[in-house]
């Protein structure tokens, strides 16, 4: 065991070394964008890391115990644009702490308990546009040294200890300031002197947020002749009287957008009535919003008498018990009613209204007709509304409508094809229940429509003309619907300008080969979440602009036989993830294609095998499938193929020989009808008729010869007659050899069959007659015949008295060999049937 002294001698130097190593070198920052963006959050840094590149532009150092920022703390990052120092326990910021950051546009100091802030703490920030100093113990704007930040657009000092709303004189230098957030401070009163700087140097684009300050007094005239872009006062008043008094104190203010109300679950008011907003009559307001008043408002129309001339009116999360007609007295151009509670759907008659947003409301589920002649934008989504008939000009009281959103509602019965609404460009029905969609061309009149969403609308497409008329459509979303027999027909023939098509979750199993032929402009096609079992590329051959094709979450095992040559060259992204790939030898070419196209495929590393079971879950890219059969199986297979091939060749070559063999077996024991079958050339037929037949059949004893012109059966193949009538029914074969014989294919064929016949019958049955001398060069062309004539006895015809006598005596003797006397004799035939027939 190591002694204590030796152990101490080892540990002390190691600890000394570790104490010299900077913590920032132990835990490196996360490189989000190389050389640009680094996240160093919660790495226990006590100082600014210096091991990051000078080119860093975005740096997150939040939740590190930096505590102190000295001069030039960030000199190593001259290109820095965004710096997050949230909750770094910073207590002291010295002069010139950010001196080298001339490009910094955003500085976040949220949650730092700053106690010492030098006058030059923010010097050098010549490009700063956004400063967030939330929860920094800031007690006053007067001592906040930012007067030189002339580029500043947004100042957020919410959740601090500021008690006075007095804007310091240096605000006159902040000419670009657009947003000042003073919410959640301690401001209770606003006096005329607090806003003197805004009288001297008006900030016309300034948005001021004073929410969550416990205000109880605004001096009348404090905001007189002051112009603001936006003023937000939410959760500021603890009673109705205080609210009324403070709103009256805003008299003379000219504001583009005024937001009043409370926050969800943070209400201070016990009651609310129309008197609270009477002071608004003394303000000039362009847009008004009232949010989160959890009270039952009864006479809402009288409540907003002072707001009849605003251009935009908005109610968010307000409960309205009873609504009179929104009549023509209101000059609103935009009306927004969001997440409100109504007793019934309000009756709207507003001649100047151009935009109506009525979403996520409760109560009044039945839509009633409205009269809005100038309406161009209508959002009725997420209300659970039901429409007994939709859609036409009479439903909305306008012919100017361009945008219509009826998504996330109840049952909508399509009873009209948008008559009077021909100007529509955007139409959304998603997640509503559409009825009668496939009974007629619903969209026939919408030739200006650009966007259509009928996703998840319980639509079953059974009518090919469902999209007729949509000649300008560019985006079509119809996910989550169904098709008759799960087959996609040719329903897009008129959508020649379509660029985006979503057919996901439609239970599709097959599609027409010409379904997309007219979509030459299509760029994105989503076919995911369907039931395709193979990747059929043929339907996409005409999509010359296609860039993205999503086939994920299907049941694709392989591609169809036409391979994958039909994918357009423009395709950049193909998603085949989460399919049922069959990783077997049968589909090896498809699996290899996946590997070859990894640059085209999206998340190719997520493509996994589904079958066989031993490869389930294995990435297709890492698959090394071996498609080699057992050598024995290969050998047997090759040998079998060779044997079959040889047998087939032999059968083809010796077909007639086999026929002869079969005949021998069949007629082997039968009687011979003919004494001889005569093989001769048709050119020698005169000699056969006048000499051979006359002398043998009319002589003593008579012999019966088989001759083709006389004894062959009509209608039977020549070869069959030769074999069955000639060889099988004859004792002998007479071969009449001449120059014509040697040059005849049929004669040579008969001669070869005769040799086989002689071999099978086991007797010397061939008698050769050389009718005329044949040139040896010609005879040698038939090797076997030449050999037989050289080795065997044959008869030679001589046209003389003695020669004739000897010839016929020898021939009769040869024919009598093996013949029992029969006065009826035997017969024979000739060879060149084709030659004879053609003559």
From Swiss-Prot:
Membrane topology, record value: Single-pass type I membrane protein
Residues on Extracellular side: 24-631
Expressed in which tissues: Highly expressed in placenta, spleen and peripheral blood leukocytes. Detected in monocytes, macrophages, dendritic cells and several types of T-cells. Expressed in pancreatic cancer cells but not in normal pancreatic cells (at protein level).
Entry keywords, A to Z: Age-related macular degeneration, Cell membrane, Cell projection, Disulfide bond, Endosome, Glycoprotein, Immunity, Inflammatory response, Innate immunity, Leucine-rich repeat, Membrane, NAD, Receptor, Repeat, Signal, Transmembrane, Transmembrane helix, Ubl conjugation
Outcome of swapping residue 711 to K: Abolishes LPS-response
Induction: By LPS in plasmacytoid dendritic cells.
Disulfide-bond pairs as recorded: 29-40, 281-306, 390-391, 583-609, 585-627
Residue ranges constituting the TIR domain according to the UniProt record: 672-815
Cytoplasmic side: 653-839
Gene Ontology molecular function: amyloid-beta binding; identical protein binding; lipopolysaccharide binding; lipopolysaccharide immune receptor activity; NAD+ nucleosidase activity, cyclic ADP-ribose generating; protein heterodimerization activity; signaling receptor activity; signaling receptor binding
LRR repeats: 55-76, 79-100, 103-124, 127-148, 151-172, 176-199, 205-225, 227-247, 331-351, 352-373, 374-394, 400-422, 423-444, 448-456, 472-495, 497-518, 521-542, 545-565
Location within or outside the cell: Cell membrane; Early endosome; Cell projection, Ruffle
Leader sequence residues: 1-23
Family: Belongs to the Toll-like receptor family.
Reported function: Transmembrane receptor that functions as a pattern recognition receptor recognizing pathogen- and damage-associated molecular patterns (PAMPs and DAMPs) to induce innate immune responses via downstream signaling pathways. At the plasma membrane, cooperates with LY96 to mediate the innate immune response to bacterial lipopolysaccharide (LPS). Also involved in LPS-independent inflammatory responses triggered by free fatty acids, such as palmitate, and Ni(2+). Mechanistically, acts via MYD88, TIRAP and TRAF6, leading to NF-kappa-B activation, cytokine secretion and the inflammatory response.
Protein name in the entry: Toll-like receptor 4
């Amino acid at each position: 065991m190591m002694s204590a002294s030796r152990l101490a001698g080892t540990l002390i130097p190691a600890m000394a070394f570790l104490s010299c190593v900077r913590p920032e070198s132990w835990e490196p920052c996360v490189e989000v964008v190389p050389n640009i963006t680094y996240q160093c959050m919660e790495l226990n840094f006590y100082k600014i890391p210096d091991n990051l590149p000078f080119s860093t532009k975005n740096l997150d150092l939040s939740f590190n115990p930096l505590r102190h920022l000295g001069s030039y703390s960030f000199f190593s990052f001259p290109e820095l644009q965004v710096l997050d120092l949230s909750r770094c326990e910073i207590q002291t910021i010295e002069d010139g702490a950010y001196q080298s950051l001339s490009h910094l546009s955003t500085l976040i100091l949220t949650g730092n308990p700053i106690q010492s802030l030098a006058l030059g703490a923010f010097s050098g920030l010549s490009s700063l546009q956004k400063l967030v100093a939330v929860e920094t113990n800031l007690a006053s704007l007067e001592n906040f040294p930012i007067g030189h930040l002339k580029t500043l657009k947004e100042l957020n000092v919410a959740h601090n200890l500021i008690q006075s709303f007095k804007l310091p004189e240096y605000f006159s230098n902040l000419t670009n300031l657009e947003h000042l957030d003073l919410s959640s401070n301690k401001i209770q009163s606003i006096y005329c002197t607090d806003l003197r700087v805004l009288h001297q140097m008006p900030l016309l684009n300034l948005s001021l947020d004073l929410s969550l300050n416990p205000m109880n007094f605004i001096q009348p005239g404090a905001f007189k002749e002051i112009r603001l872009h936006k003023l937000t006062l939410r959760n500021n008043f603890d009673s109705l009287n205080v609210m009324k008094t403070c709103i009256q104190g805003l008299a003379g203010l000219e504001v583009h957008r005024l937001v009043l109300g409370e926050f969800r679950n943070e209400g201070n008011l016990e009651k609310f009535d129309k008197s609270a907003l009477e002071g608004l009559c003394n303000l000039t307001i362009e847009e008004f919003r009232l949010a989160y008043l959890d009270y039952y408002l009864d006479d809402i129309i009288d409540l907003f008498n002072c707001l009849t001339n605003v251009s935009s009116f908005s109610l968010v999360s307000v409960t309205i018990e009873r609504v009179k007609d929104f009549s023509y007295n209101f000059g609103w151009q935009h009306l927004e009613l969001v997440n409100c509670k109504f007793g019934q759907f309000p009756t709207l008659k507003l001649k100047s209204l151009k935009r109506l947003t009525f979403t996520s409301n409760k109560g009044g589920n039945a839509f009633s007709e409205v009269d809005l002649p100038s309406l161009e934008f209508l959002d009725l989504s997420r209300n659970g509304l039901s429409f007994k008939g939709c859609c036409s000009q009479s439903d909305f009281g306008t012919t100017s409508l361009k945008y219509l959103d009826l998504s996330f509602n109840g049952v909508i019965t399509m009873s009209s094809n948008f008559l009077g609404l021909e100007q529509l460009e955007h139409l959304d029905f998603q997640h509503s229940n559409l009825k009668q969609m496939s009974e007629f061309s619903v969209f026939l009149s919408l030739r200006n429509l650009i966007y259509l969403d009928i996703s998840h609308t319980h639509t079953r497409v059974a009518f090919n003309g469902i999209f007729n008329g949509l000649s300008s459509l560019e985006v079509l979303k119809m996910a989550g619907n169904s098709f008759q027999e799960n087959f996609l027909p040719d329903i897009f023939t008129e959508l020649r300008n379509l660029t985006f098509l979503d057919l996901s979750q439609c239970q599709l199993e097959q599609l027409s080969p010409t379904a997309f032929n007219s979509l030459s402009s299509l760029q994105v096609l989503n076919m995911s979440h369907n039931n395709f079992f193979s990747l059929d590329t043929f339907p996409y051959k005409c999509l010359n602009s296609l860039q993205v094709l999503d086939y994920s979450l299907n049941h694709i095992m392989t591609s169809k036989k036409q391979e994958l040559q039909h994918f357009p060259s423009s395709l950049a992204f193909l998603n085949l993830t989460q399919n049922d790939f069959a990783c077997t030898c049968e589909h090896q070419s498809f699996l290899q294609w996946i590997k070859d196209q990894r640059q085209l495929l999206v998340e190719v590393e997520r493509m996994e095998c589904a079958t066989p079971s031993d490869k389930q879950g294995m990435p297709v890219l890492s698959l090394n499938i071996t498609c080699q059969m057992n050598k024995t199986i290969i050998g047997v297979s090759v040998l079998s193929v060779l044997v079959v091939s040889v047998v087939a060749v032999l059968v083809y070559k010796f077909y007639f020989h086999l026929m002869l063999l079969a005949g021998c077996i069949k007629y082997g024991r039968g009687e011979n009808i003919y004494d001889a079958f005569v093989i001769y050339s048709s050119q020698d037929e005169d000699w056969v008729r006048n000499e051979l037949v006359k002398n043998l059949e009319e002589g003593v004893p008579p012999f019966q010869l088989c001759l083709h012109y006389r004894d062959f059966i009509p209608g039977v193949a020549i070869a069959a007659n030769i074999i069955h009538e000639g060889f099988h029914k004859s004792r002998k074969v007479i071969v009449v050899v001449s120059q014509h014989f040697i040059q005849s294919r049929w004669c040579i064929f008969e001669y070869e069959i005769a040799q086989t016949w002689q071999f099978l019958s086991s007797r010397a049955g061939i008698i050769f007659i050389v009718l005329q001398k044949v040139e040896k060069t010609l005879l040698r062309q038939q090797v076997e015949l030449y050999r037989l004539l050289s080795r065997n006895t044959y008869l030679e015809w001589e046209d003389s008295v003695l020669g004739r006598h000897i010839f016929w005596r020898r021939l009769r003797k040869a024919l009598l060999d093996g013949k029992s006397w029969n006065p009826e004799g035997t017969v024979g035939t000739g060879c060149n049937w084709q030659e004879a027939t053609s003559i």
